[in-house]
């Protein structure tokens, strides 16, 4: 399969995983390894250097040099807060990669498009590699691309809902128009949904809740890895066209033409 490229960096896996909701750092690490993900997100609100478990979680990730740690700004409510969080992350974690999340509504956690665009413009100016989480809005995604975002990350459904690709028609347009990688983020609840996103032409998917709340998270991580690989292979193989009428795979020409 073709490798994923983001901001000049190559990734062997098209499955990104989050680190929230796991019962322990041991389980989180086992999931990351089973997924074979090369991009792992961690919420900045959980990062307090010297605090113990969160530090342990981060150390579990960074001891695998093949994995890129992607801090995210989950919990911030404005561009100003996002920029402050980004600078703290760069200092604490020594990375300029950032998953930008700005969602002021604590109930639905939907991203604020205006503040996200403002934050992206300023963070790019400051030298960050910005991966913004956004509504599945094709116009907004083009503005973010023009502002210098390294990817766009439209939601499939609200965070943690496991409802799947409720925004699929808008995602199709975003994929068609985008000149930067499109990563489907939020709402994916089953491996089949991840495969569908990849078949549509998404460059990657990010999954957290669907793995973390599974009865067997490690096996679920493996299932998502295989689904993402299968979906991408199907996309690269070029799916057949959808028809409204039947077309025989074995034509009846000369069938039982006996003399």
Swiss-Prot record:
It is found in: Cytoplasm. Catalyzes the rearrangement of 1-deoxy-D-xylulose 5-phosphate (DXP) to produce the thiazole phosphate moiety of thiamine. Sulfur is provided by the thiocarboxylate moiety of the carrier protein ThiS. In vitro, sulfur can be provided by H(2)S. The active site is at 99 (schiff-base intermediate with dxp). 1-deoxy-D-xylulose 5-phosphate binds at residues 160, 186-187, 208-209. SUPFAM superfamilies: ThiG-like. Keywords: Cytoplasm, Schiff base, Thiamine biosynthesis, Transferase. GO terms for molecular function: thiazole synthase activity. This is Thiazole synthase. One of its GO terms (cellular component) is cytoplasm. Belongs to the ThiG family. Homotetramer. Forms heterodimers with either ThiH or ThiS. The keyword Transferase applies. It comes from the Bacteria.
């Amino acid at each position: 399969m073709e490798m994923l490229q983001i901001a000049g960096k190559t990734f062997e896996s098209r499955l990104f995983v989050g680190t929230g909701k796991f019962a322990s750092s041991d389980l989180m690490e086992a999931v990351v390894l089973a997924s074979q993900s090369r991009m792992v997100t961690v919420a900045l609100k959980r990062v307090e250097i010297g605090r113990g478990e969160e530090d342990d979680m981060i150390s579990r990730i960074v001891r695998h040099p093949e994995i890129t740690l992607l801090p995210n700004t989950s919990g911030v409510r404005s561009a100003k807060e996002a920029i402050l969080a980004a600078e703290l992350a760069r200092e604490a974690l020594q990375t300029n990669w950032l998953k930008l999340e700005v969602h002021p509504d604590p109930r639905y956690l939907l991203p604020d498009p205006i503040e996200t665009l403002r934050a992206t413009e300023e963070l790019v100016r400051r030298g960050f590699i910005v991966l913004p989480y956004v509504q599945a809005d094709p116009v907004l995604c083009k503005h973010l691309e023009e502002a210098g975002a390294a990817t766009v990350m439209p939601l499939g459904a609200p965070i943690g809902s496991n409802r799947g690709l409720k925004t699929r028609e808008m995602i199709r347009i975003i994929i068609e128009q985008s000149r930067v990688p499109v990563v489907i983020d939020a709402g994916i609840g089953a491996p089949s949904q991840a495969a569908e996103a990849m078949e549509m032409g998404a460059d990657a998917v990010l999954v957290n809740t669907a793995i973390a709340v599974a009865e067997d998270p490690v096996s679920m991580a493996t299932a998502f890895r295989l689904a993402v690989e299968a979906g991408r292979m199907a996309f690269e193989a070029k799916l057949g066209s959808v028809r409204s009428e039947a077309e025989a795979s074995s034509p009846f020409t000369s069938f039982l033409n006996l003399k």
